[in-house]
């Protein structure tokens, strides 16, 4: 069985799959609108020099999330 991680813990250059969103309703709707639904593959594109925010590639779209947001998205590594 695959191990669970916070999205913010996934190294740059790795791909993971969304398992669960542990966010409040307002942020949850924003994340869902961006296409980050369960079983969606997410590629960690790059981190800013200060480590926050991080750019992710989701369904051919680049989005940036802060660490505090990534901490609430549970993923499995591919």
What do these predicted ranges mean?
Residues 23-24, 46-51, 62:
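Short, charged beta-turn/beta-strand-edge "cap" motif at the junction between a beta-strand
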Residues 9, 20, 44-46, 77:
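A residue-level detector for short acidic-glycine micro-motifs
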Residues 27-30:
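Short alpha-helix capping/helix-loop boundary micro-motifs
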Residues 51-78:
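C-terminal structural segments of small proteins and small subunits
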Residues 17, 33-35, 46-49:
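Charged, well-structured alpha/beta interaction segments
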